[in-house]
Amino acid sequence: NGFGVIFIAGFTATNKLYGLLETAATSYGYAITTYTGQNVGAGKYSRISRGMRAGILISMVTSLMIAALMLIFGKWILSCFITAEGQEGIGALKVAYRYLAIMSVFLPILYILHVTRSCIQGMGNTVLPMVSGLAEFFMRTGTALLFTLLLGSDGIFFAEILAWLGADLILVPGYFWMRRNLG
């Protein structure tokens, strides 16, 4: 690729940390899937809306706290993932932190994605989550190709975020449609 070793090292470091940042979102998703499935099975549909509101609220608080921590301590944390020294290490850390800062600001979008997708799955719908996954793929790929032409290497940082947004644009209206038609 044309991004260079320093860029790839920084990008990779942030992606390693991203896996950790997503852990709470994944856990909230597992919880809401079980909660929703149990309430669908019991015919207590009104509880699904309450659970979803609580899940979104907890997700927003968590994602904003994580974002603040990453903006404050991100460079220090990223330095644990970057082994290069000298100018290469400084350059990789600069790339990594820029990507982390951008990603952190938009972390609530990812958390909404996990909670909403999982709630829909708990309601028994597997098609909307699959379609949203396809939207993520095409948004990520399209953004990576287009935005790098427009913004250079910084364009790649927005591919993940716009992939999340693309999925949310399918999942959020889908949730409301399903919830209205559930009972």
PLM regions with names:
Residues 139-148:
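Transmembrane alpha-helical segments of integral membrane proteins
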Residues 7, 32, 95, 115-116, ...:
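Hydrophobic alpha-helical segments typical of transmembrane helices
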Residues 10-68, 72-74, 110-132:
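Small-residue-rich hydrophobic transmembrane alpha-helices
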Residues 26-29, 103-122, 128-140, 156-172:
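Short runs within selected transmembrane alpha-helices of multi-pass transporters and secretion channels
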Residues 36-105, 147-183:
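Short alpha-helical transmembrane segments in multi-pass integral membrane proteins
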Residues 3-4, 32, 73-77, 143:
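Hydrophobic/aromatic end-of-helix segments at the C-terminal termini of transmembrane alpha-helices
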Residues 1-19, 88-95, 125, 158:
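Interfacial/gating helices of multi-pass transporter permease domains
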